[in-house]
Amino acid sequence: MEKTQYPVILFSHQGLSIYQTHQETYGLDNYQEIQNLLQEHNRLHPERKVIASFNGHTHAENIGGIWYISITSMAYHWLGEDYEYIRYSPEVDKNFRWIKYTAPFKEPLFTTVEISSNGTIKIAGKKTEWVGPSPFELGFPENLKPYVHPWITKRKLRF
């Protein structure tokens, strides 16, 4: 980041912010340390600051002037053994032994992100449906509805 002449966008699998589910906490253990380093970089280099961090687990929030944005998985949401449900044929279940612990999407989820020099991040929305019952129809915790859904939310964020 020290050598770039441009704004910085990070991509990671695990989030650089944190959120708690009924089973576990998602995010890196040292997320606070990383956030502090990024915010310090922004303080020292406002002309080439970190504007966003994209990941695949949590949601969108602005922390210290940096957008931490999750993009829902392309294929499914992991539910775990407590929510086992066979959604496909016995053959598919046999060949993909973990699939019964997921809530798969009918179609792949993907999006486009436009980052503009006018200080905006535009995320195109995309919707699909669950294959079979939703996680919540299987008893998945209702308080996780803001994070577990078969769509990517359309957003316009300012940085």
Predicted segments, located by residue:
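Active-site metal-binding loops of divalent metal-dependent hydrolases
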Residues: 14, 56-58, 73-74
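Active-site-proximal segments of metal-dependent phosphoesterases and phosphodiesterases across multiple
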Residues: 2-54, 63-64
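Intrinsically disordered, low-complexity regions enriched in small/polar residues
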Residues: 8, 21, 28-36, 40, ...
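Acidic carboxylate-rich catalytic motifs and surrounding loops in phosphoryl-/glycosyl-chemistry enzymes
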Residues: 51-58, 126-128
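Binuclear metal-dependent phosphoesterase catalytic core
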Residues: 61-159
